[in-house]
Regions:
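Non-catalytic, topology-defining segments of multipass membrane proteins
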Residues: 1-186
Length: 186
């Protein structure tokens, strides 16, 4: 468990992550224009929401990685964890560390995404600000000893944003701008 000081910690703003989320929200505005709409794009959005949130985050990051709720063949585990990384809620190692910290100190000062401080923090703040105690490499390592040596998870940790751009280009090639707008931005 991180040792928290009584002094309010100095948070570091992550311009890259914040810029990425601004880019996503600005891109989402294109959904209001007819040239960025297709029913196949809507179907893609619904499918990706299920795949990234339900399978990737809930099943992969949460049940499988955080709580070790099951044993899976390596290729299945890697597939669902990859799907979780596409949700853009951080890479698997940091997400798991933060969630384990959350369970260790739910809604206290030891919770990295407690709603007690603000409505903003648990929804996006914890991802765009680096907290000196929760995001310290040694603390992350301490909470993720069972997964942090996995090379594939390390790759996803470093590249989950880049993977969005690769997926965006694939969607552009297959379904045009509507697939990018509805498959990436929304």
């Amino acid at each position: 468990m991180p040792t928290l000081s009584r002094v309010k910690p100095k948070l570091t703003f992550n311009k890259g992550i914040a810029g990425f989320f601004i880019f996503l929200h600005l891109g989402a505005l294109l959904a209001f224009f007819p040239f960025a709409f297709s029913w196949s794009a809507v179907a893609l959005m619904l499918f990706l929401h299920w795949l990234t949130a339900s399978i990737g985050i809930c099943f992969g990051y949460h049940r499988y990685l955080t709580h070790r709720g099951m044993d899976l063949p390596k290729w299945v585990a890697n597939t669902i964890v990859f799907c979780g990384s596409l949700a853009c809620q951080n890479g698997p190692i940091k997400w798991v560390a933060h969630h384990r910290m959350h369970h260790a100190g739910s809604d206290t000062e030891r919770d990295p995404h407690s709603a007690k401080n603000s409505l903003w923090w648990p929804h996006l703040g914890w991802m765009i600000y680096k907290h000196p105690e929760f995001d310290d490499d040694k603390v992350i390592q301490n909470y993720t000893k069972d997964i942090s040596d996995n090379k594939f998870y390390q790759f996803l940790e470093k590249n989950y944003i880049k993977n969005q751009f690769i997926l965006g280009f694939i969607f552009l090639a297959i379904g045009g701008l509507p697939w990018v707008v509805w498959g990436i931005f929304l």
